[in-house]
């Protein structure tokens, strides 16, 4: 009941007019859900004689997926804090030239910092998708659909986090930072799309959907 209450409270806050939590936290949560689903497939595989040949590897996947999930949960909070820093910077006084200059420096620094959580979400979820693709191949076949769900959620998390990065990029004045961020976003999105497609091909084959 306590867990249900916390989830309900988060969803209530997400759906409210409050600025946080927002898309950044939701993206990280989607990634955490993907990691949890992939872990479930692994948990249902370990200890089964049919999959004894991959048992040790599956146990490693469980540990890594759990670490990824925990990291993504932390990034939910990090994203909220980063947004609050941006908001605070925009509220700084701008009555004089000195104040405006100081405010601009603070805003640019906060925007740069605000890109870090969603970029970390993208990196962590791409790693999660790599693990998901593997468990889809070697895990219990009857829960392959759950691995597919994890892959779909994971790609959605990456694409959503990309928007949160780009929302800050368009306000940055540092051209090198803009260039680097755009390159990272494009790379992560391409990687996520490739992993999702490969995982889904495996899932469809194991579910007998290609017949």
Model segments located where?
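Register-specific recognition of a single heptad position within extended alpha-helical repeats
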Residues: 52, 56-59, 63-66, 98, ...
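A structural-propensity feature for long, helix-poor, extended segments
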Residues: 49-89, 188, 195
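Preference for long, well-ordered alpha-helical segments
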Residues: 124, 128-131, 135, 142-205, ...
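Short, hydrophobic/aliphatic alpha-helical segments
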Residues: 2-21, 141
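Amphipathic alpha-helical interface segments
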Residues: 79, 83-152, 156, 168
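Transmembrane signal-anchor/signal-peptide helices with a preference for the extracytoplasmic
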Residues: 40-52
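Conserved phosphate/anionic-ligand binding catalytic regions in large, soluble enzymes, centered on
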Residues: 16-39, 142-161
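Amphipathic alpha-helix face/heptad-repeat signature
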Residues: 29-33, 61, 68-71, 75, ...
């Amino acid at each position: 009941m306590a867990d249900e209450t916390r989830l309900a409270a988060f969803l209530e806050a997400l759906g409210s007019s409050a600025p946080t939590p927002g898309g950044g936290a939701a993206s990280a949560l989607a990634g955490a859900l993907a990691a949890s689903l992939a872990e479930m497939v692994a948990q249902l595989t370990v200890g089964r004689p049919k999959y004894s040949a991959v048992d040790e590897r599956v146990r490693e996947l469980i540990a890594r997926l759990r670490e990824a999930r925990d990291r993504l949960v932390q990034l939910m909070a990090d994203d909220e804090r980063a947004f609050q820093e941006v908001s605070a910077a925009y509220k700084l006084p701008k009555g004089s030239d000195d104040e405006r200059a100081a405010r601009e420096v603070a805003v640019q620094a906060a925007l740069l910092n605000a890109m870090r959580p969603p970029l970390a979400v993208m990196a962590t979820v791409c790693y999660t998708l790599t693990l998901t693709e593997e468990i889809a191949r070697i895990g219990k076949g009857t829960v392959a659909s759950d691995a597919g769900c994890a892959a779909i959620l994971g790609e959605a998390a990456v694409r959503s986090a990309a928007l949160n990065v780009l929302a800050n990029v368009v306000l940055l004045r540092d051209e090198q930072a803009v260039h680097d961020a755009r390159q990272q976003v494009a790379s992560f999105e391409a990687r996520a799309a490739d992993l999702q497609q490969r995982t889904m091909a495996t899932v469809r084959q194991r579910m007998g959907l290609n017949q």
